[in-house]
Curated annotation (Swiss-Prot):
Listed GO CC annotations: cytoplasm
The keyword Cytoplasm belongs to this UniProt entry's keyword annotation: yes
Record family assignment: Belongs to the ArgR family.
InterPro entries: Arg_repress, Arg_repress_C, Arg_repress_C_sf, Arg_repress_DNA-bd, WH-like_DNA-bd_sf, WH_DNA-bd_sf
Keywords noted in UniProt: Amino-acid biosynthesis, Arginine biosynthesis, Cytoplasm, DNA-binding, Repressor, Transcription, Transcription regulation
Places the protein is found: Cytoplasm
Gene that encodes the chain: argR
Gene3D superfamilies the UniProt entry points to: 3.30.1360.40, Winged helix-like DNA-binding domain superfamily/Winged helix DNA-binding domain
UniProt name for this protein: Arginine repressor
Pfam families hit by this protein: Arg_repressor, Arg_repressor_C
Domain of life: Bacteria
PANTHER family linked to this entry: ARGININE REPRESSOR (PTHR34471:SF1)
Keyword Transcription: yes
Pathway(s) where this gene product acts: Amino-acid biosynthesis; L-arginine biosynthesis [regulation]
């Protein structure tokens, strides 16, 4: 299980690095990932990841050729599995925040509102890709967080 978590963290870090749009070579990406603590990464692995996630080289705002990820895919459809639309679930001591694919927040929020108080959800506010969840009892926010994560098979 630890290996899977490490792989998930690597993917998240890899995507974050590419979003910076400042790495022009695979070796620069390797160095950046190694600086983040992924010592077993090499150019071959980076090459496979770039291919897997559809990364392309393009010009950034400074007109430098850099690797970047393609824009998010289109608006979710009714056939989109809901668990694939949830990108991140996090919380502080008062609120749970769910990040979704663009356009999916209201759909997910409606589902969460339908579950309601029995599962610890007082209410939601949804934008385009972010949902704020107010727990019905702040002392039980961890339990509500587990419920929300389990709904979408979210393991992080």
């Amino acid at each position: 299980m630890q290996a899977a978590k490490t792989q998930d963290e690597l993917v998240k870090t890899f995507k974050a690095i590419l979003k910076e749009e400042r790495f022009g070579s695979q070796s620069e990406i390797v160095i950046a990932l190694q600086a983040e603590g992924y010592n077993n990464i090499n150019q071959s692995k980076v090459s496979r990841m770039l291919s897997k996630f559809g990364a392309v080289r393009t010009r950034n705002a400074k007109q430098e050729m850099v690797y970047c990820l393609p824009a998010e895919l289109g608006v979710p459809t009714a056939g989109s599995p809901l668990k694939n639309l949830v990108l991140d679930v996090d919380h502080n001591q008062a609120m749970i925040v769910v990040r979704t694919s663009p356009g999916a927040a209201q759909l997910i929020a409606r589902l969460l509102d339908s579950i309601g108080k029995p599962e610890g959800i007082l209410g939601t506010i949804a934008g385009d890709d972010t949902i704020f969840i107010t727990p019905s009892n702040i002392q039980e926010i961890d339990k509500t967080l587990i419920t929300v994560k389990s709904l979408f098979n979210f393991t992080n």
